Amino acid sequence: MTAKTIRHYLQFKDFSLEDYEYVLERTGILKRKFKNYETYHPLHDRTLAMIFEKSSTRTRLSFEAGIFQLGGHAVFMSTRDTQLGRGEPVEDSAQVISRMVDIIMIRTFEQDIIQRFAENSRVPVINGLTNEYHPCQVLADIFTYYEHRGPIRGKTVAWVGDANNMLYTWIQAARILGFKLRLSTPPGYALDTKLVDAESAPFYQVFDDPNEACKGADLVTTDVWTSMGFEAENEARKQAFADWCVDEEMMSHAHPDALFMHCLPAHRGEEVTAGVIDGPQSVVWDEAENRLHVQKALMEFLLLGRLNH
């Protein structure tokens, strides 16, 4: 693979609509193979480096199991295992690590870190999560919606809660995939427009009232009130976000067959009630599982391109 052919997945907008149509189709195929216990090893002897500056259950398990199921291997590295944790420049780490593996996933803090890493990498780099964006999770959410309700184009998605990496990724997805996003965040926790492309403006609408944001929604989604790195603000956030808990009353404003999603881990009684997350409209377990399947399709696509079969 030459430098000119390398593609990275650092933000949702890095792929086109056609790319997503292909990856979602491949996700369905790979999931069926998984459910049917079919052996499929297109990435035989390929190695995935997983660099974690932020810990995770779902991200590590889904990527590690995913590359193994495709015939490859994974190497886990935390800041204790790399020179990144000891002050080595990101650019130097990228040069070294990318000479020894075939693909890299990074879960870190600032988007700038993964951007600089990718600019100096000889192999594809995947964003496993940054403070600004979480494209793999939203891709899994999109596939989950597709499984349950069909294409998301023209539908309405409601976001209730913090203006975090999930929300900024949903905004990018709305523009590329052609759906409407209605969002509501508490006063003092508003959208940072510097993280939003001007082209995305027609695809989202901001509401002060979370119930109004959920009106007619086909999908209602939320996340924790206190993301990793903001623990010192936890008590203040609990007070500020009290009216942004997705409960049965809020869901009643959505479409009658609306789905509920949460990227997990969830705090029942805070951002969502047990009645909603454990209720019939919730698809959070399918959503979590689908991280495995979309990331397998993503790695296959980044390493092999479009397959004819």
UniProtKB/Swiss-Prot annotation:
A GO CC term attached to the entry: cytoplasm
Transferase is among the record's keywords: yes
A GO biological-process term: arginine biosynthetic process via ornithine
An annotated Gene Ontology molecular function: ornithine carbamoyltransferase activity
Annotated positions binding carbamoyl phosphate: S56, T57, R58, T59, Q83, R107, H134, P135, C136, Q137, C263, L264, R291
Listed Pfam families: OTCace, OTCace_N
Keywords of this entry: Amino-acid biosynthesis, Arginine biosynthesis, Cytoplasm, Transferase
Catalytic activity: carbamoyl phosphate + L-ornithine = L-citrulline + phosphate + H(+)
Entries under InterPro entries matching the protein: Asp/Orn_carbamoyltranf_P-bd (IPR006132), Asp/Orn_carbamoylTrfase (IPR006130), Asp/Orn_carbamoylTrfase_sf (IPR036901), Asp_carbamoyltransf_Asp/Orn-bd (IPR006131), Orn/put_carbamltrans (IPR002292), OTCase_ArgI (IPR024904)
Binding, L-ornithine: N165, D223, S227, M228
Alphabetized SUPFAM superfamilies for the sequence: Aspartate/ornithine carbamoyltransferase (SSF53671)
Family: Belongs to the aspartate/ornithine carbamoyltransferase superfamily. OTCase family.
Function in brief: Reversibly catalyzes the transfer of the carbamoyl group from carbamoyl phosphate (CP) to the N(epsilon) atom of ornithine (ORN) to produce L-citrulline.
Full protein name: Ornithine carbamoyltransferase
Organism (species): Burkholderia mallei (strain ATCC 23344)
Upper classification of the organism: Bacteria, Pseudomonadati, Pseudomonadota, Betaproteobacteria, Burkholderiales
Gene expressing this chain: argF
